């Protein structure tokens, strides 16, 4: 099926919304309803454009933001709370999946790296 411009525009709006609301849990269904398209169509367009589903992409954005916070001295529990993770364990699970180490290890590596600059 060829891309549907209406669906792609909705996917871009969802992406922009996620960037501005990292800590909020997104409801793809509610967003799609607002856009007058089905959730399935929105997810399909989003995945075609960004290679991940909206939920996967939002998690990647949150973990990337956690990296920034940790690099700037935040602790994992503060980062988890600020970015909408249910708790520090949730951040740690997602962080390990995406980055390959715990938030604490990442922060320690970043801190050790600063001493060499």
Question: Where is each model-derived feature located?
Answer:
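Basic/polar phosphate-binding segments, predominantly the helix-turn-helix DNA-binding elements
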Residues: 25-61, 80-105, 109
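C-terminal regulatory/oligomerization modules of transcriptional regulators
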Residues: 114-117
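Residues within well-ordered alpha-helical secondary structure of globular protein domains
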Residues: 17-20, 48, 72, 97, ...
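A short, Lys/Arg-enriched amphipathic alpha-helix from helix-turn-helix/homeodomain DNA-binding modules
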Residues: 1-26, 31-35, 57-75
């Amino acid at each position: 099926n060829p891309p549907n411009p209406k669906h792609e525009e909705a996917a871009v709006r969802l992406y922009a919304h996620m960037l501005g609301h990292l800590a909020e849990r997104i409801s793809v269904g509610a967003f799609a309803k607002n856009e007058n398209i089905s959730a399935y169509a929105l997810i399909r367009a989003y995945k075609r454009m960004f290679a991940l589903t909206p939920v996967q992409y939002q998690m990647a954005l949150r973990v990337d933001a956690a990296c920034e916070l940790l690099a700037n001295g935040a602790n994992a529990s503060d980062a988890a709370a600020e970015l909408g993770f249910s708790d520090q364990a949730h951040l740690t699970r997602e962080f390990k999946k995406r980055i390959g180490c715990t938030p604490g290890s990442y922060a320690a590596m970043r801190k050790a790296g600063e001493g060499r600059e």
